[in-house]
Amino acid sequence: MENISDLWNSALKELEKKVSKPSYETWLKSTTAHNLKKDVLTITAPNEFARDWLESHYSELISETLYDLTGAKLAIRFIIPQSQAEEDIDLPSVKQKHAHDESNHLPQSMLNPKYTFDTFVIGSGNRFAHAASLAVAEAPAKAYNPLFIYGGVGLGKTHLMHAIGHYVIEHNPNAKVVYLSSEKFTNEFINSIRDNKAVDFRNKYRNVDVLLIDDIQFLAGKEQTQEEFFHTFNALHEESKQIVISSDRPPKEIPTLEDRLRSRFEWGLITDITPPDLETRIAILRKKAKAEGLDIPNEVMLYIANQIDSNIRELEGALIRVVAYSSLINKDMNADLAAEALKNIIPNSIPRIISISDIQKAVGGVYQVKLEDFKAKKRTKSVAFPRQIAMYLSRELTDSSLPKIGEEFGGRDHTTVIHAHEKISKLLKTDTQLQKHVEEVKDILK
């Protein structure tokens, strides 16, 4: 076969005969061939849940089918679009399409074909970020430069960045657009120093028209990489090239980020994305169902949208889980079936009531302090500091009064509790180790 896409399409036709229609529609139909390297065929699955299911339930069947077609024993590897964006694409059609990139020693733009402005669902939480992204795509380096988009995981930051890239290339096929994560930027920079190819690295990223860099917060604490990105930023900005940056937090909240970088990130426009509201979540589910060719009852979409309000990735994953569950037990989808399918991933609707004793036990576990020491008169730092953390969390996570908290810590005065709360609050603004420990305690208490 000339092209691995042809090979995979032939394999899909055979697989369609071997599995039930619901199974084929749910798991196999939306897969695509990514590349074939050293007898390993990489297949792209639409999401993590589908990838994991394919790996555990269909790898052997797929290998057998491919052997029947080719006579070769191929190993099968599954990836999702996000991880695909970090790899080199080997499809001949793609190589030919981007020949101009290779001639300039530039990386592939690595854009996910599913992440466009047309597939982006607009809601109150992302409307401004969408408008800003579209403005940048329509007039690179003229509207907002840089554009800094921040928000939680799975809310659409990466989608908007890819959409910008697609739009620019569609309207200017010769534009040099590069998307990468800050982690990849860091790794390539380190390798360039090791291999004495620093000049090649700089030329690679300072000669693009649009640079889309994801998860910039991972540059925190990496002084040399920040230095390199600072100069890359300057070179692109001075040449009026567009820079788009994403992060899980605004520039001012990224710890150990150099002030000069923080200042430059604030030169253009900073916009955030917040979790989608109910109407937007329903719209996202409808668009996902339509894209996957799934017929989902309204009551099921409403149930999922009401239960999953954290991010889009979990929302779409829940939908796929319900569809899979329905096909496996061979029952029609309804709200009751959705509840059964999602019972292990939906948080308990009754929030856990945290007690001061719970907090003392959790802090004691992290800091190796015995429960009785929280009430004792010991003032050694190894006990006193964890005790202050426990007082702080008791104030933050319970409804207990100051005197009540003091009483639970060996009858201490309420002013001691106030002092502990103020001290820990102040330290949390700068002490990353303390931040980590407090989050660890909170995770234990969940």
Swiss-Prot record:
Residues 327-446 are annotated as: Domain IV, binds dsDNA. Residues 1-81 are annotated as: Domain I, interacts with DnaA modulators. The keyword Nucleotide-binding applies. GO terms for molecular function: ATP binding; ATP hydrolysis activity; DNA replication origin binding; lipid binding. Residues 110-326 are annotated as: Domain III, AAA+ region. It comes from the Bacteria. GO terms for biological process: DNA replication initiation; regulation of DNA replication. Residues 81-109 are annotated as: Domain II. NCBIfam families: DnaA, PRK14086.1. Belongs to the DnaA family. This is Chromosomal replication initiator protein DnaA. The lineage of its organism: Bacteria, Bacillati, Bacillota, Bacilli, Bacillales. The gene is dnaA.
